[in-house]
Swiss-Prot record:
Residues 68-77 have a biased composition (Acidic residues). It comes from Drosophila melanogaster (Fruit fly). Residues 60-99 are annotated as: Disordered. The modification Phosphoserine is found at residue 69. This is UPF0729 protein CG18508. The keyword Phosphoprotein applies. Keywords: Phosphoprotein.
Length: 99
């Protein structure tokens, strides 16, 4: 036979989390986000997938691209013409790394 506290404690915890705690947190919530002055921040975060300026950054079911690195794709599309062009390209890459 199951002991009485093994039934009562889970039942009380369920009632607390589902009914009592949400009501109490409306009036007293020490975990609410606050600004530097201690005022409660009412505004939630913006939805990251809003269409601004007529352009949607996220299109569900849009084009799926393969995971190919950009450097490999650029080299295969635009191969260097000669050794001088290749040397100049490596110098530019090295200067970018130094900065």
């Amino acid at each position: 036979m199951v002991c009485v506290p093994c039934i009562i404690i889970p039942l009380l915890l369920y009632i607390w989390h589902k009914f009592v705690q949400p009501i109490l947190l409306r009036y007293w919530n020490p975990w609410e986000k606050k600004d530097d002055d201690g005022n409660v921040i009412k505004k939630g975060p913006d939805f990251p997938f809003e269409c601004k300026g007529g352009v949607c950054p996220f299109v569900p079911g849009g084009k799926k691209t393969e995971n190919v690195s950009d450097d490999d794709a650029e080299e295969s599309e635009n191969p260097p013409l000669n050794a001088t062009a290749m040397a100049a390209e490596t110098e530019v890459d090295e200067s970018k790394k130094e900065i």
